[in-house]
A protein has these predicted regions:
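Secondary-structure junction motif
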Residues: 194-216, 286-287, 303
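Short helix-boundary/capping micro-motifs
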Residues: 14-32
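A short LG(V/I)-centered, amphipathic sequence patch enriched
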Residues: 44-61
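Flexible hinge/capping segments at coil-to-helix
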Residues: 160-200
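A late-sequence structural motif
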Residues: 262-304
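Alpha-helical linker/hinge and terminal dimerization helices associated
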Residues: 46-47, 68-90, 303
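Hydrophobic hinge/microswitch elements
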Residues: 131-136, 140-144, 149, 217-261
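Central regulatory/effector-binding core of bacterial HTH transcription factors
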Residues: 93-156
Length: 304
């Protein structure tokens, strides 16, 4: 058995397991599928063991593969920390790489980032606004180091910390002359009104799907006319009288204050949820990353 392991091959193995799909991992790593398969085979040859069992359902770890995967997680985190710290040594300005779900990233965090920046002008801050699933993926790919999402990921390699509660509201256009201007409906009536939802891999979709299931209702039971991947696009549709949608209060606060949108109460359904800061299990925050997290968790965060 070889004493040295190729870290690139190890990363390819790690990504294949995380995505349970060779083609998906190859796409993310910018490799061809044969190229990725070759790297996996080379890693197995280096270690002298079989790591993966391939099937139509994806890949399955062998007992040896489970051991190597745990070490891969740790080693890749250490590698990321080394690269980050070496880069910081040769840069005058520390960096924050943040990924945030759209509800927080578009409506709340900009003001918080501004406030934090006012107190720490030496920091360069880069934030990507994505849906929650993509935030998790970029965190695990080491593209970002701090994530903020709309649900608690079911991943043992991710640490979560709740930061704030919110509520999903059913909203419609506030217009007494329009047929979409209603203020209260039953669960039965919910199945009839035209709905515009967020896309399937978004945190908002996950939260409402879970809430409806708790009441014995499924998305398929609803009159969903289309889905969009942008809260702003959904609000434009609602304001044009196209239908209703479930959106976080954080995303519709201004429209509610102005009276452009109104809340539609649903009998026996209140959908509350939390936003979470997420991090990789073996990742060590830099001084400024920890300062930013402490700030976001505190009452001084100053959400918009």
């Amino acid at each position: 058995m070889c004493c040295f392991v190729n870290l690139e091959y190890l990363k390819s193995f790690y990504m294949t397991v995380k995505h349970n799909n060779i083609s998906k991992a190859a796409e993310i790593l910018h490799l061809t599928q044969p190229g990725l398969s070759g790297q996996l085979k080379s890693l197995e040859n280096e270690l002298g063991v079989t790591l993966l069992i391939r099937s139509n359902k994806g890949v399955e770890l062998t007992e040896e593969g489970k051991v190597v995967f745990d070490y891969a997680d740790t080693l890749l985190s250490i590698q990321g920390n080394i690269k980050r710290d070496l880069v910081n040594l040769h840069q005058d300005r520390p960096k924050l790489l943040i990924g945030a779900c759209k509800s927080v990233g578009e409506y709340a965090l900009p003001c918080s980032i501004y406030t934090f920046k006012q107190h720490h002008k030496e920091v360069d801050i880069h934030m990507e606004v994505l849906n929650s699933t993509d935030v998790v993926e970029k965190l695990m790919d080491h593209t970002i180091n701090i994530g903020i999402v709309q649900f608690r990921p079911k991943n043992d390699d991710i640490l979560t910390k709740p930061i704030v509660s919110d509520e999903l509201l059913l909203v419609g256009r506030s217009d007494s002359d329009n047929e979409t201007s209603i203020k209260r409906i039953s669960m039965g009536e919910l199945k009839l009104i035209p709905l515009i939802l967020r896309e399937h891999n978004s945190g908002t979709f996950y939260v409402i799907e879970k809430a409806l299931k708790s009441k014995g209702l499924h998305i398929e039971d609803l009159n969903v006319i289309y889905d969009l991947n942008s809260p702003e696009a959904i609000k434009s549709s609602i304001l044009s009288g196209k239908g209703f949608s479930f959106l976080p209060r954080m995303a519709v606060e201004q429209e509610l204050k102005k009276g452009n949108l109104q809340i539609v109460q649903i009998d026996d359904l209140k959908v509350c949820f939390k936003y979470y800061i997420i991090s990789r299990k073996n990742y060590e925050y830099t001084e400024y990353e920890q300062m930013f997290i402490d700030f976001i968790i505190s009452s001084k965060r100053g959400f918009c």
